[in-house]
């Protein structure tokens, strides 16, 4: 499909493709000249592959060419083999792939990002995979934070109010979340309208969801849930000055690599930003040619 110049009357959250449910695919689409997001998805086992997205987020900011958010139970979603380039974005800018507010589990492989604010944004979630991507003129290439673990009252209350109910009461329409609906969930769960992440088929297909139960054992009125971020990032190619921008929980000041605590050395901090202070790498003048040699191996 060729999709362009949409959302003329209502600019926000009217993407070219909007997928809600399970097992849908957005494949071989050319989407451009949109005021906001190109592709949005909510659910499980979604695939966004082989698309070219450019000149989107032209009249808005804090948005992504591809967007999903706010649910730990979204699993099996893959974004791969997409060419995402030359985005707009005002204020907070435009992201290539925007994983918002602790959504988790997105697999992002073999994408090419060029000329945008952040290539991949992971907003406090867990179980991400970022492999074999190329980042050109994105600063930073990858942004990752621990908003799910911060003690700040805005995020800690949000964890209890939004994320905890979506773990125990998986709704038929995951982005519908009125106050009335939330208050009625417990009754509907017993009537079979809702399922829990600990029930089949969720826990059977995604056994990693069981780990979240430990974090959600607090009572409903508590506001101190802590869910640290986690991601596998490997074999990517970084051209930008800043490869990673990472914001951690100020109460721990700890970095981990593959489950082991690591010291914040100068070499490591070349790829990490601590609370907004960029530590930038030197760009080789030879990088004017952005083609890769046939035997090029990405950063481990």
Roles of regions detected by a PLM:
Residues 1-7, 20-36, 44-58, 74-88, ...:
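Right-handed parallel beta-helix
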Residues 1-39, 100, 171-176, 182-195, ...:
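Long hydrophobic alpha-helices with heptad-repeat/coiled-coil character
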Residues 4, 13, 54, 67, ...:
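Sequence-level detector for tyrosine residue identity
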Residues 10-20, 37-43, 61-71, 90-102, ...:
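Glycine-rich beta-solenoid repeat tracts in large extracellular/virion proteins
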Residues 14, 36-38, 75, 80, ...:
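Aromatic-enriched hydrophobic runs in primary sequence
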Residues 151, 155-224, 243, 251, ...:
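Long intrinsically disordered, low-complexity regions that are acidic and Ser/Thr-rich
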């Amino acid at each position: 499909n060729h999709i362009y110049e949409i959302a003329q009357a209502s600019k926000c959250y009217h993407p070219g493709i909007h997928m809600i449910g399970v097992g849908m695919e957005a494949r071989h689409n050319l989407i451009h000249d949109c005021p906001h997001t190109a592709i949005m998805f909510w659910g499980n086992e979604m695939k966004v592959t082989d698309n070219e997205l450019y000149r989107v987020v032209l009249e808005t900011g804090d948005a992504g060419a591809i967007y999903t958010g706010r649910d730990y139970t979204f699993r099996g979603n893959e974004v791969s083999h997409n060419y995402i380039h030359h985005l707009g974005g005002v204020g907070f800018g435009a992201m290539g792939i925007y994983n918002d507010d602790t959504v988790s589990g997105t697999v992002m492989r073999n994408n090419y990002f060029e000329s945008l604010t952040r290539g991949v944004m992971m907003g406090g979630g867990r179980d991400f995979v970022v492999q074999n991507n190329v980042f050109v003129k994105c600063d930073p290439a990858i942004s990752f934070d621990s908003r799910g673990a911060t003690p700040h009252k805005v995020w800690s209350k949000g964890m209890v109010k939004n994320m905890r109910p979506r773990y125990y009461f998986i709704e038929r329409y995951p982005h519908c979340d009125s106050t009335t609906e939330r208050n009625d969930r417990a009754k509907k769960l017993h009537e079979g309208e809702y399922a829990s992440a600990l029930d089949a088929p969720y826990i059977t297909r995604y056994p990693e969801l069981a780990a979240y139960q430990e974090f959600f054992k607090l009572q409903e009125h508590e506001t101190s849930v802590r869910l640290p971020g986690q991601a596998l990032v490997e074999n990517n190619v970084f051209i930008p000055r800043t490869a990673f921008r990472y914001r951690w929980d100020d109460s721990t000041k700890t970095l981990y690599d593959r489950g082991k605590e690591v010291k914040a050395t100068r070499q490591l901090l070349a790829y990490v930003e601590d609370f907004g202070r960029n530590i930038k790498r030197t760009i080789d003048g030879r990088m004017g040619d952005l083609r890769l040699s046939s035997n090029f191996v990405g950063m481990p």
